[in-house]
Amino acid sequence: MSASRAVLPFALLCLTACATKPPYQARLADTQADCVERFESVRRHPLAVLDAKSRAKAPYVEFADVAQCLRTAQGSTALALYAIDEASRPAQVDISILPSPGGTFAASAELLDARFQRIERHSFAEFTRRGGEYSLSLFLDRAGPVYLMLVPDQDQVGKQESMIGSVNNQMMVPAGPVMFAVNHGAETQTIRAFMAGGRLKVTMRPEGSAAFSH
């Protein structure tokens, strides 16, 4: 057998394996290791105003990758803490959650002051289903909050949404000199679980600018 013939089956096998990507599965943040016991010690992510092009290019990230464990007297919880650029105000923060059959992050958003005291809280029920994502926009005035905190909304974690769709298939059937098209339609149902993890994106824009550009 020539070398080219020997390599061909291997190449086809590799191509098939590389093209087969496992389905997405949301990861949960670790609430056992790397825990801190004070808000001041929680890792912070800077949040500043971006132009429209930069906001559109901003990637979705796993909550587990941006969250850290905070241990309190009530127990341990995973949270993502964003430090808001005060010089950029007034502005608006846009939070986007990407739904997936592998897990949708049921997020609760809280705005905190400089002492990490809650100013306002928004449950996952306040997020709006807009196109292919859940979204929430928060207005920040000049004397507004210093931090944005995202945590799992325990009232929604464990629930699920059901999406109904349809699939249409067409098959061409020969009948002598002509062809007939046979159409077959079927209803589909997609179940998406609300979890304590999933993909999200947080951006900040100038006040009055368009919120979401896709």
Where are these regions (language model features)?
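Bacterial N-terminal signal peptides that target proteins for export
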Residues: 1-8
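C-terminal motif of bacterial Sec signal peptides marking the signal peptidase cleavage site
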Residues: 15-17
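Bacterial signal peptide processing site
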Residues: 19-21
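C-terminal edge strands of extracellular/lumenal beta-sandwich accessory domains
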Residues: 23-66, 153-214
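Non-catalytic, beta-strand-enriched accessory regions in extracellular/secretory proteins
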Residues: 61-87, 133
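Noncatalytic modules at the cell exterior or secretory-pathway interfaces
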Residues: 89-93, 139-161
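Short coil-to-beta strand junction motifs in C2/discoidin
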Residues: 101-107
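Solvent-exposed serine/threonine-rich low-complexity stretches and specific carbohydrate-binding patches
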Residues: 120-129
